[in-house]
Every structure is written in C-alpha cells, then in structure tokens.
C-alpha cells in the first residue's frame, strides 16, 4: 500500500527511469511498520506475535540484502567463476550472515539476472523503515510526518539527500544501525520469547 499511496500523491506524474527505487522500498516497508498500531484491532491477542514476525522479516531483509549484494559483487569481480564455486561462495556468505548455508537458492532470485545490485536496496530500505518504527515508538505523530514527507519524493531525487531532507538517517551509518538494533532489543527483548515486550 505504500507504493499505492505514493502513486496517489504523484497524481499525473508517471514512473520513469528517474525514479528512486530505494525510496520506493521505504514507502512500502515504512507503511508496514506504521500500521503496527492497528494490529490489535485486526489480530487481537495475536497482534504482538505478528508485529514480532514483521520486525524479524525486516531484520531478515537487511541480512539477506547484504548477503546477496556481497555475492553479486564477488561474482561480477570474477565473471569466469565456475558454477560450483558460485554455489560454494553463496553457501559461505549465507553461513556468515544467517548462520546456515544456502547453496543453490541464489538462482531463484531474478534480481541477480535482471537488476544486478538492486537487491541491497531491500536492506537499506529496511534499515530506514526500522528507523521510522523506532521514531514512532518515541513520537508516532512525528514519524507519520516523516513518512508523509518521504512519500512526496520519488522522481529525480538523490537517495541520501532525500533521507536527510525528511529527517531520516543515512542507513549506511553505524549510528543509525546501532540505534535501530537497540530499539529492536529494547522493544522486543530479543533474548526472550516472541511477543514478550518489556513492561
């Protein structure tokens, strides 16, 4: 629905090659986290479990996006790499990032073939969406204003400049990642069970 909201705001403007797809992913993922306040109405007593699952999905997007990008960079640096080496490389990278190897699954990701180096956008946008979620924990109205302002941007804009303009941090900065990680730890008590929030 975040993409739809952005299209609605664009009016007559059509998507073109100048679209910033990195921002478009934040439009989508950001709206997902801002909807958490409605989960209790929709899911009742299961709301905290579903919120937990959504947050873990975003964390997974960060890890997977970085893993696939590292894999792509290595393959593009060595275009003659044999297939068996690619499979082993993918397995090792996944072991490093996720704690388990995925050997052949990379062939199912069409981005590797159709839009190389785009997959990392899911990671950077997830960091920004998680920052928006952390902002909403402190001040939901402010987070909504940031999101609303962000959705005004799509065509012919610079990624990091736009994030700064709307009040979001550089997702590549360690400060941003540490703040998001701390918010996740504090809110979800990651050492505890899913759905067991701090009192």
Model segments located where?
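Catalytic Zn2+-binding segment of zinc metalloproteases
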Residues: 1-14
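Short beta-alpha connecting loops at secondary-structure transitions
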Residues: 11-19, 50-57, 76, 109-110
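Short, structured coil/loop segments at alpha-helix boundaries
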Residues: 13, 20, 42-49, 174-177
